[in-house]
């Protein structure tokens, strides 16, 4: 059995035509040659196989399915599951998408058709291979079945009658496999027949059309292929790896292959399913949910599998074998690459990722008999190998019965290798000796020849021939002498060895006390006798299963070795082998059963036996050596005698020949003497050898005596071995008896234990019954007593009733309650004893937290998915708009109109890109939501039981030990459900109330609209007002008042507090006063002499004309400026939480059109006289600000009832906050003024802004401070006043100062004269940055997305240029800075907020931020130069602060701080484009970077984490970190003091200023602190050589003078 994980393959289908037309983007990416897929930008999944969009069908099959089909023929089950959302290509991948009218192409065949082809092709190959090998042809049986699971009913797709689903039952057979009863199983014989069955079944499958798929599968389909085969079983392998030959045996294998085509998961919202389709979708999702629960249980944490809910669904029951059972399983997860299906694709990948953790236990489905035969064969092979190892001595059994490798085996291996090594060495030495002997002979021959040649000889013709003959003769004699010497040396060494052996045997014999006699025994006969005894002993040993080797063969093999040294080594090896075999037999007996009593005796016998055997072996070896030595000496003696005789003969022959030749007598004598000397030497050697021979004979006699001793020892050895065998037999018998006794004792103990257990259970059952009986009796007794008491009380009551005294009624009433309380109290006591309330409370807390976590996760995911769906719908709408505009562009011939269409198309494409970015961002958020929630919960959760925290909710409920604990949890769960239901009902009630209120407001708005229509119609102002209202505003009047409520831009909340101090008389005009005024007060004439009187009811009969006018007037009355272009542009990003804008940017509007439409209404230009007169009756916006626009009294009621109502209701509005709605909507209420009702909402906003401005105006002045705050470093000298709201920014040059405020103004000041020079216009929103341009007469003011350049040389301070964040440059006269417009809370499309800006020290470059980048401007040419790239790490972040400086070399350096905590350095040139960061300062801050300051070779950075960091500009390393430099987050940094000795100044949100000494050391030293230097936070600071200026949220600027001046 082998564990194998479920294989998972991911297949991404190609995009469809509809998805491409809808503009869906690909949200998945696959790494090449790597099974990894990435979704959402950074969420990656790794599977066993990943197939991207262009993957063909055959690649999918060959990569992961083909090997499963091959395993089918080895008896292994297999399953292929196709999972995914509807329309993701599951049916196409599996190959069941058949069309009766279309023939399917070969390359389009799916997994199932290809598997069928592969199966029958493999069958043919197996039969052909068997025939080639001469084996029996295997027999195959193939059958198929095809079922579908429709609405949780199993239907047979191959059956003619598919209505009988109740007859199909799911069972589990004896082997644990799932089988279906009642399903038709058809036998197939070829591929075509199987394909026909598959096609017919696929056509019977339930399909239907949905919004996502024209042919959507409405059921789960399972096609099963059964294969049975009978083949020749393979023989087992031997040690060499070859198959053993033997009888042929057959084996039976059976396997099944499930092809599962799961129906796709559906969302009713997207599929549009209703009725039966909806029911089918619900059933499909329920089955897939149960499948997901099974996968989650099998692939749980730490590999622990608890209860697996297979029975929750028929689908999981059918797939029980495939998931966690006996099957090789492959899941093919099909998904869509389109971002419109992003959520479903992500869920599919998560689903498949969990399936990878499942482990199946796979075994071959083999017949029982063939399986048993295979197991026995493998067992026999293993036993044979083990037996061989025991025979060879590789394994032995120690005293404890454990198998160990014999030490003698390792020793034998070592000695064998050593002998081989010595043999090679001896061979090499012999070769070397032969070479040296030859060289020695040559040298001696040459020496003798030279000595002979030096003798004087008589000249003869044959002298040269004689010399050669003499030389050859000398050489022969020398060779013979050398050979004789070597033999002599060998004989001497042998004699020495024999002497040593003799001395050793003498010492041994003396120690044994053996006195050798002169008994004459024949050595050979004694050896033969010893051999016979050994043979008898061997047979005796074999009779008791003691293996051994043939001793005679051992002796014969030892006698054949020629070398004495090697003979001794091999004899020792053979001797050790023999001892090893004998010891092995004894140890095999010892292995079986052991006896401590006999073990000691056996050990002593074994030791003595070993010693005697070794002595016998040594004697035998000495006898053999003596025999060999004797033969050798005899041979050498004969050789020496022959050589002496030959030498004498040769001598005589040489002398005779010399005498015949008549040579020199002296020479002959010399030769004769030399030969005589040689002969003498040889005779001496011969005498020595004869002496040795005599001594050898003595040794032989001694060895015969020792041989007698050997015979005696052998007889003793035989006796000892017999004793050993008897002891072993006795030990075995004792062990058998002990084992039998132990088994009997174990059986008896088990029986006793079982009886004890049964008795204990019986006792426990009886005790329980007795306890129940006692409780029942007690309860019965109590009830009887209670009834008796009730009866007695009833009788007493009856008697009292008869007597007229109603006593005892209370007792009757209270007795049942008392009885119930007693019973409940007893039950509660039992419950308290049954479980621990504290442990249940802990478990309940864990359950509540997990429920809250799951609910929170689901809420977040649903919210993100809804946001993603909204962006997808918006993208679809933009795509439709682009297509429509392109169509009109191709059809139109008007050049101007075509240009407009091109502009609209470009704008729509830009909007499309923005929407696509938002879609990508939402996808990334959805991918990261699980990790973020998990991390959040880990940080916020209290410390609880770790074991409980790791369990799921289901596991916690399943782990209830007692019924009381379950009741406890259910009670709390019931209470929790009631609380949540009550809360939900309350929220629903509030929602309905709000909806009713909205509806009421809509009705009131409609009524007021009708009133306004009637009023304006009576004054004939419709045509005149429509004349100057822009056409696009007229077209935009298509939505209801409720849509206006939703689309209105938020207004500034801070502006509302300025109207709260008005206290005026409240009077609200009623509808009767407006509709049914009398003739005196309801006249609509503003001037009786100038204008004719018009009756309100005079035009009632003019229905058509009045209806048309009403429509036009309705447009005029409900067209807000904030929504004029809300439908043509997309929503821009909102202001960040750290910006100095406090109003929220909502929709997008074009304020130029608004201003153009508002201007005529304010100035009265472009309007007819009648309309101008009607508008002139509105309150003037140019009155004296000291008086206020509502201080002036209107004419009396005689002028008109309208003006009276307007006057009264206007004062009413001042007492409320409805004029400045915090939500910025255009909805009206009953308390809104008539002025607000009779004028457009954008006009009301303008008037409201003027109201706020006039009532908050302060006198602009610079006031000296008496007794100002004084310290060691600086002293407060002056205070600048003049702004109505907080001052956000300040900058100075030599004589001038500029300030920017929340009141949307910037002011230019003369700091020497202490006066205001000029107010620099009204800006769209807060002026959060102001900057002087060095070496020029320009000053910049920054508000929202605009940077305005002002020339302050002229008294008017003209606006020269307007630079937008997008890089657009406008002329200064393109905006009318003198006009007062409403506060702009929206930004146009493609524009972003300028959150940071700075001018370089040369005055040539301007740096402005836009999102995560910084744009660089050339101020000489007024055009953008380039940008600083990636100033923040994330493109969703933005630059929060910016500073520039110049190096001594003239390079310009820019330092940026971002909201994602990082600070970067850029080196900027005049002709640069995209500039990458030069350095990134690490480590980053822990929060948003609020200020950066380069100062004296260092960079100081501050952040919301209230820390200040000091970096070196040389290497970019941090030198110091000042922790908690302030109590609140730091908003500004600047340097103060003389150059080179500046102090670092920091200011924070609570108005505190701190001075730091940063030059004396690497650390920062606090010099002085000015707490509460301002009442509110300090937003900005700047300084000169001796002055410090602080801009605060208390609408003032503080002037501080250095005390060192």
From Swiss-Prot:
SMART domains recorded: KISc (SM00129), WD40 (SM00320)
Kinesin motor domain boundaries: 5-358
Residues the entry annotates as binding ATP: 84-91
Binding site for Mg(2+): 91, 217
InterPro entries according to UniProt: KIF21A/B_hel_2, Kinesin-like_fam, Kinesin_motor_CS, Kinesin_motor_dom, Kinesin_motor_dom_sf, P-loop_NTPase, WD40/YVTN_repeat-like_dom_sf, WD40_repeat_CS
Intracellular or extracellular location(s): Cytoplasm, Cytoskeleton
Swiss-Prot/TrEMBL GO biological process terms: microtubule-based movement
GO terms assigned for molecular function: ATP binding; ATP hydrolysis activity; microtubule binding; microtubule motor activity
Cellular component, GO, one term: microtubule
Keywords (A to Z) from UniProt: ATP-binding, Coiled coil, Cytoplasm, Cytoskeleton, Hydrolase, Microtubule, Motor protein, Nucleotide-binding, Repeat, WD repeat
PROSITE patterns, A to Z: KINESIN_MOTOR_1 (PS00411), KINESIN_MOTOR_2 (PS50067), WD_REPEATS_1 (PS00678), WD_REPEATS_2 (PS50082), WD_REPEATS_REGION (PS50294)
Pfam families with a match to the protein in the record: KIF21A, Kinesin, WD40
Main location: cytoplasm
Protein origin, superkingdom: Eukaryota
Coiled coil residues, start to end: 575-730
Enzyme class, first EC level, given as a word: hydrolase
CDD domains: KISc_KIF4, Rcc_KIF21, WD40
Low complexity composition-biased segments: 1200-1232
Stated role: Microtubule-binding motor protein which has ATPase activity. In complex with alpha and beta tubulins, preferentially binds to the growing microtubule plus-end to stabilize it and detaches following ATP hydrolysis. Negatively regulates axonal length through inhibiting microtubule polymerization at its plus-end.
Description of how the protein assembles with itself and partners: Component of a complex at least composed of alpha tubulin and beta tubulin. Within the complex, interacts with the alpha tubulin and beta tubulin dimer.
Family assignment from sequence similarity: Belongs to the TRAFAC class myosin-kinesin ATPase superfamily. Kinesin family.
Protein known as: Kinesin-like protein klp-12
Organism per entry: Caenorhabditis elegans
Organism phylogeny: Eukaryota, Metazoa, Ecdysozoa, Nematoda, Chromadorea
């Amino acid at each position: 059995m082998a564990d194998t994980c479920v294989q998972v393959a991911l297949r991404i289908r190609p995009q469809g035509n509809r998805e491409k037309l809808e503009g869906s983007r690909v949200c998945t990416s696959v790494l090449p040659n790597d099974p990894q897929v990435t979704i959402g930008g950074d969420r990656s999944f790794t599977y066993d196989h990943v197939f991207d969009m262009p993957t063909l069908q055959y690649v999918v099959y060959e990569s992961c399915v083909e090997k499963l089909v091959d395993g089918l023929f080895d008896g292994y089950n297999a399953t292929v599951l196709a999972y995914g959302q509807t329309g993701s290509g599951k049916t196409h991948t599996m190959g069941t998408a058949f069309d009766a009218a279309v023939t399917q192409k070969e390359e389009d065949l799916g997994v199932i058709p290809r598997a069928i082809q592969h199966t029958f092709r493999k069958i043919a190959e197996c039969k052909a291979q068997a025939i080639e090998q001469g084996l029996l042809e295997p027999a195959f049986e193939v059958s198929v079945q095809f079922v579908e699971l429709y609405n949780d009913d199993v239907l047979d797709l191959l059956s003619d009658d598919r209505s009988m689903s109740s007859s199909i039952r799911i069972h589990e057979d004896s082997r644990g496999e799932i089988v279906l009863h009642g399903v038709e199983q058809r036998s197939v014989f070829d591929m075509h027949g199987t394909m026909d069955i598959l096609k017919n079944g696929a056509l019977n499958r339930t399909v239907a059309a949905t919004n996502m798929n024209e042919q959507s599968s409405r059921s789960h389909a399972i096609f099963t292929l059964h294969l049975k085969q009978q083949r020749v079983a393979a023989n087992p392998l031997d040690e060499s790896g070859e198959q053993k030959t033997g009888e042929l045996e057959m084996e039976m294998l059976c396997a099944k292959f499930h092809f599962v085509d799961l129906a796709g998961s559906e969302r009713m919202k997207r599929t549009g399913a209703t009725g039966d389709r909806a029911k089918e979708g619900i059933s499909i999702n329920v089955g897939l949910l149960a499948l997901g629960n099974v996968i989650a249980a099998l692939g749980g944490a730490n590999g622990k599998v608890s209860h697996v809910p297979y029975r929750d669904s028929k689908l999981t029951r059918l797939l029980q074998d495939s998931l966690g059972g006996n099957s090789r399983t492959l899941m093919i997860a099909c998904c869509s690459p389109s971002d419109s299906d992003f959520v479903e694709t992500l869920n599919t990948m998560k689903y498949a990722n969990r399936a990878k953790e499942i482990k199946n236990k796979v075994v071959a489905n083999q017949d029982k008999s063939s399986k048993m035969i295979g197991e026995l064969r493998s067992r026999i092979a293993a036993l044979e190998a083990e037996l061989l190892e025991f025979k060879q001595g590789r394994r032995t059994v120690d005293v404890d019965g454990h198998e160990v490798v014999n030490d003698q085996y390792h020793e034998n291996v070592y000695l064998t290798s050593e002998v081989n090594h010595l043999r090679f060495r001896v061979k090499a030495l012999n070769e070397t000796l032969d070479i040296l002997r030859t060289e020695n002979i040559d040298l001696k021959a040459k020496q003798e020849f030279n000595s002979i040649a030096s003798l004087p000889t008589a000249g003869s013709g044959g002298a040269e021939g004689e010399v050669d003959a003499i030389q050859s003769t000398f050489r022969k004699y020398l060779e013979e002498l050398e050979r004789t010497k070597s033999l002599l040396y060998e004989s001497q060494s042998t004699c020495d060895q024999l002497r040593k052996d003799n001395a050793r045997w003498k010492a041994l014999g003396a120690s044994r006390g053996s006195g050798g006699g002169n008994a004459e025994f024949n050595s050979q006969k004694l050896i033969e006798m010893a051999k016979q005894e050994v043979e008898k002993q061997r047979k005796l040993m074999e009779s008791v299963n003691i293996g051994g080797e043939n001793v005679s063969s051992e002796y014969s093999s030892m006698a054949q070795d020629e070398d004495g040294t090697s003979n001794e080594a091999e004899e020792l090896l053979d001797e050790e082998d023999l001892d090893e075999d004998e010891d092995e037999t004894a140890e095999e007996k010892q292995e079986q059963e052991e006896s401590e009593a006999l073990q000691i005796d056996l050990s002593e016998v074994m030791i003595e036996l070993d010693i005697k055997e070794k002595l016998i072996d040594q004697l035998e070896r000495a006898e053999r050596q003596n025999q060999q030595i004797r033969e050798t000496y005899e041979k050498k003696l004969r050789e020496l005698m022959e050589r002496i005789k030959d030498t004498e003969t040769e001598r005589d022959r040489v002398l005779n020949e010399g005498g015949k030749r008549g040579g020199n007598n002296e020479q002959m004598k010399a030769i004769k003497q030399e030969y005589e000397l040689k002969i003498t030497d040889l005779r001496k050697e011969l005498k020595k050898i004869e002496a040795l021979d005599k001594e050898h004979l003595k040794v032989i006699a001694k060895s015969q005596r020792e041989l007698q001793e050997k015979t005696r020892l052998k007889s003793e050895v035989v006796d000892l071995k017999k004793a050993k065998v008897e002891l072993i037999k006795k030990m075995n018998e004792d062990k058998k008896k002990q084992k039998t006794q132990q088994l009997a004792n174990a059986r008896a103990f088990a029986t006793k234990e079982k009886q004890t257990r049964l008795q204990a259970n019986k006792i426990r059952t009886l005790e329980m019954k007795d306890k129940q009986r006692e409780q029942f009796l007690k309860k019965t007794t109590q009830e009887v007593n209670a009834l008796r008491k009730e009866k007695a009380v009833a009788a007493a009551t009856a008697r009292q009733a008869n007597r007229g005294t109603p006593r005892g009624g209370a007792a009757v009433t209270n007795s049942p309650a008392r009885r119930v309380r007693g019973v409940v109290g007893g039950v509660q006591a039992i419950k308290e004893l049954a479980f621990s309330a504290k442990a249940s409370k802990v478990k309940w807390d864990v359950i509540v937290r997990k429920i809250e976590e799951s609910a929170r996760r689901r809420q977040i995911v649903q919210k993100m998915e809804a946001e993603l769906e909204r962006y997808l719908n918006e993208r679809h709408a933009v795509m439709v708009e682009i297509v429509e505009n392109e169509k009109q562009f191709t059809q139109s011939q008007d050049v101007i109109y075509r240009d407009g269409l091109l502009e609209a198309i470009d704008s729509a494409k830009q909007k499309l890109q923005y929407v696509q970015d938002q879609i990508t961002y939402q996808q990334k958020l959805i991918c990261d939501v699980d990790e973020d929630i998990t991390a959040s919960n880990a940080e916020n959760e209290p410390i609880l039981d770790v074991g409980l925290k790791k369990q799921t909710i289901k596991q916690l409920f399943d782990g209830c030990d007692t019924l009381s604990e379950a009741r406890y949890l259910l009670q709390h769960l019931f209470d929790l459900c009631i609380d949540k239901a009550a809360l939900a009902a309350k929220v629903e009630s509030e929602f309905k109330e709000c909806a009713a209120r909205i509806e009421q407001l809509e009705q009131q708005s409609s009524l007021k609209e009708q009133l306004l229509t009637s009023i304006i119609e009576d004054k004939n102002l419709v045509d005149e007002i429509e004349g100057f209202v822009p056409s696009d505003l007229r077209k935009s009047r298509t939505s209801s008042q409720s849509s206006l409520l939703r689309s209105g831009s938020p207004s500034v909340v801070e502006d509302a507090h300025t109207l709260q101090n008005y206290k005026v008389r409240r009077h609200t005009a009623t509808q009767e006063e407006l509709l049914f005024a009398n003739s005196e007060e309801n006249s609509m004439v503003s001037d009786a002499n100038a204008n004719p009187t018009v009756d309100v009811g005079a035009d009632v009969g003019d229905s058509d004309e009045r209806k048309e006018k009403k429509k036009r007037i309705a447009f005029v009355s409900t067209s807000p400026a904030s929504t004029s272009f809300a439908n043509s542009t997309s929503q821009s990003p909102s202001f960040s939480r750290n910006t100095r804008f406090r109003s929220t940017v909502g929709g997008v509007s074009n304020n130029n059109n608004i201003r153009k439409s508002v201007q005529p209404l304010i100035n009265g230009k472009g309007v007819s006289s009648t309309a101008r007169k009607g508008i002139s009756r509105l309150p003037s916006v140019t009155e004296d600000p000291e008086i206020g626009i509502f201080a002036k009294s209107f004419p009396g009621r005689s002028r008109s009832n309208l003006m009276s109502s307007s006057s009264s209701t206007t004062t009413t509005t001042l007492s409320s906050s409805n004029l400045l709605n915090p939500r910025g909507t255009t909805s009206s209420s009953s308390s809104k003024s008539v002025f607000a009702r009779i004028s457009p909402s954008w006009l009301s906003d303008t008037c409201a802004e003027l109201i706020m401005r006039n009532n908050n105006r302060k006198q602009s002045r610079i006031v000296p401070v008496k007794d100002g705050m004084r310290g060691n470093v600086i002293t407060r000298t002056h205070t600048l006043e003049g702004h109505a709201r907080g001052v956000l920014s300040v900058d100075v040059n030599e004589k001038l100062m500029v300030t920017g405020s929340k009141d949307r103004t910037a002011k230019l000041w003369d700091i020497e004269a202490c006066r205001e020079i000029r107010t620099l216009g009204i800006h769209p929103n807060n002026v959060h940055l102001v900057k002087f341009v060095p070496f020029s007469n320009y000053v910049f003011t920054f508000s929202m997305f605009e940077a305005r350049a002002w020339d302050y040389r002229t008294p008017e301070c003209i606006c020269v240029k307007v630079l937008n964040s997008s890089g657009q440059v406008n002329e200064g006269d393109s905006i009318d800075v003198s006009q007062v417009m409403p506060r702009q809370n929206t930004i146009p499309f493609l524009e972003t907020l300028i959150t940071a800006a700075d001018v370089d020290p040369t005055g040539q470059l301007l740096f402005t931020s836009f999102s995560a980048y910084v744009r660089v401007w050339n101020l000489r040419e007024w055009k953008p130069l380039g940008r600083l790239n990636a100033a923040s790490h994330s493109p969703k972040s933005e630059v929060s602060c910016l500073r520039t400086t110049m190096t001594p070399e003239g390079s310009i350096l820019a330092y940026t701080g971002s909201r994602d905590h990082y600070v970067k350095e850029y080196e900027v040139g005049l002709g640069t484009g995209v500039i990458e960061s030069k350095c990134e300062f690490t480590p980053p801050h822990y929060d948003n970077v609020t200020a950066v300051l380069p100062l004296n070779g260092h960079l100081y950075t501050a952040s919301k984490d209230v820390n200040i960091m000091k970096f070196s500009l040389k290497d970019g390393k941090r030198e110091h970190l000042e922790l908690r430099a302030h109590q609140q987050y730091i908003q500004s940094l600047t340097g103060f003091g003389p150059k080179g000795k500046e102090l670092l100044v920091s200011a924070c949100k609570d108005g505190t200023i701190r001075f730091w000494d940063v030059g004396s050391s690497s650390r920062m030293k606090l010099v002085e602190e000015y707490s509460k230097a301002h009442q509110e936070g300090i937003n900005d600071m700047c300084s000169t050589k001796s002055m410090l200026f602080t801009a605060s949220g208390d609408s003032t600027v503080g002037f501080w003078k250095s005390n060192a001046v």
